[in-house]
Regions:
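Short, conserved micro-motifs composed of acidic
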Residues: 4-52
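Short, conserved catalytic/metal-binding micro-motifs enriched in Asp/Glu and His
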Residues: 56-64, 78, 105, 109-116, ...
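Basic, alpha-helical interaction scaffolds
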Residues: 45-115
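Amphipathic alpha-helical
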Residues: 45, 180-226
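Short, charged alpha-helical motifs in flexible N/C-terminal segments and linkers
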Residues: 2-14, 123-195
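Charged/polar positions within long, soluble alpha-helices
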Residues: 3, 83, 87-90, 110, ...
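C-terminal helix/juxtamembrane-tail motif
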Residues: 40-42, 242, 248-275
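Conserved, non-catalytic sequence blocks in retroelement Pol enzymes and Pol-derived host proteins
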Residues: 65-74, 88-99, 117-127, 155-161, ...
Length: 275
């Protein structure tokens, strides 16, 4: 006998502007009759509830696929932890703050970030504001600028860490799915259904560049649409690393990436770059 679904925990999440929003039902066992020779079952159909968002493996997915609800929830949890740290620790030095922040606050803002990484300036600033406010808890650093506080604490911006995590995930995928044919020096996909389309023409850039497909506003938030423009700008030495550790080391030195301590959406950093 197979385990049946708990219909009360099953929901329907409709995606897409043109979705027809059909009703869906699951069979639910309602009656069992046992005899000396057999067992008979009676089923009834349970209509599944329609929802606008659903949490799966710790990530809240909404019907617009913009993950604003998930981002708001994680910011709220991170702020709650900051409030506890501020109340329970009257004095924080740099070492103690780094330990508490990295273990209790930052994980809320980074868990599964390649899935929900924000694409709007508003959401990027909202997430970064948590770390901006947190770094002021160290009394000796509270009067410094945000960039100076990050340098003193050796904390990269959350924006930089999300970009780095995206690139690491893409590197791992490429190592498993894309190979370089030594006879033709062309890229070949091991899997015909690969989500990446190698660029076979042109001499500029590294040999593992991929085509950025046309996309709608919703698709613009997808992983490949977000990370491929950054990946294609990386240096050849970085993308041809023979191990993950070498790739991570290359990211720290790659000239195409911004400084890990400068928040690119900070007005002060924008002015300094223009000068």
């Amino acid at each position: 006998m197979q385990m049946s679904f708990n219909t009360k925990k099953c929901h329907v999440l409709h995606l897409g502007h043109r979705n027809t929003h059909y009703d869906y039902s699951l069979p639910k066992m309602s009656n069992i009759k046992k005899t000396s020779s057999s067992i008979s079952y009676t089923y009834m159909f349970h209509q599944l509830e329609k929802v606008h968002d659903e949490k799966d493996l710790g990530v809240t997915v909404d019907d617009n696929l913009n993950f604003k609800l998930h981002i708001s929830q994680k910011i709220s949890k991170a702020n709650s932890m900051l409030f506890l740290i501020k109340n329970y620790f009257q004095f924080l030095d740099a070492e103690m703050f780094s330990l508490l922040y990295k273990s209790l606050v930052r994980p809320h803002l980074e868990y599964a970030s390649p899935v929900w990484s924000p694409t709007t300036k508003e959401d990027i600033k909202r997430i970064e504001s948590v770390q901006r406010r947190a770094t002021k808890l160290v009394p000796q650093l509270s009067q410094l600028s945000y960039t100076e506080r990050l340098v003193a604490l050796k904390l990269p911006t959350l924006e930089y860490r999300r970009t780095r995590q995206d690139l690491i995930l893409l590197f791992n995928y490429i190592q498993q799915d894309i190979i370089l044919d030594p006879s033709t020096n062309c890229k070949v996909c091991r899997n015909n259904s690969s989500m990446l389309t190698p660029i076979t023409s042109g001499t500029r850039g590294h040999p593992f560049r991929f085509a950025i497909k046309r996309h709608t506003t919703v698709r613009n938030r997808f992983f490949t649409s977000r990370v491929l423009p950054i990946w294609n700008r990386l240096s050849t030495a970085t993308v041809t690393a023979n191990s993950l550790n070498c790739f991570k080391s290359g990211l720290r030195k790659d000239p195409s990436l911004p400084s890990p301590y400068i928040f690119t959406h900070d007005p002060a950093s924008i002015i300094s770059r223009r000068r």
